[in-house]
Amino acid sequence: MIRTTLLLAAAAVLIPAAHAQTPLDPCTLLTPDQIKAVLNSPVEPGQPGVAKGSDECTWGDANGDDRVYIALRPAADFHTFRKQIEKNGGQVTPVTGLGDDAFFVSPDESSSALYVLTKTHLLLLTVTPPDSTQQQVQAAEKALATQILPKL
């Protein structure tokens, strides 16, 4: 009886651990070469956020200017972010063909942020190429997102 109880307890501990999702390192989702191919501008290797196990990564150029930023959040945050952005007067533009749902937020005429919902994650992606229009920024964000999404 004790042996059976111990076996069941061990199974209860081990089974959820086997199904637990391994946290993704966002800095492994893109390479400097992938970014350079989209931006026509070289970048340094990605740098994780300051917190240990950060869900953020930033790629900058040799001058220290940030060029690409990604953050991974739980998928459940997607609708909360969207509602908060809309509540604060942000312009949300739906995007088709990416993930389960996606939208751009454009705070001004030359910048943008892309939010993409997958089954398990919210991907936030911003791209700041040198001397680019908002349309070029959004095209770059979509291009990089299509390279990231198969890894999520």
Regions found by a protein language model. Give the residues of each.
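Exposed alpha-helical structural elements
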Residues: 1, 34, 77-81, 136
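Short, basic/polar N-terminal leader/transit segment immediately after the initiator methionine
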Residues: 1-6, 23
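Sec-dependent N-terminal signal peptides
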Residues: 4-18
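N-terminal "mature-domain start" segment
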Residues: 19-54, 58, 91, 136-152
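A short, solvent-exposed beta-edge/loop patch
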Residues: 21-23, 93-152
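Short, solvent-exposed recognition patches
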Residues: 37-109
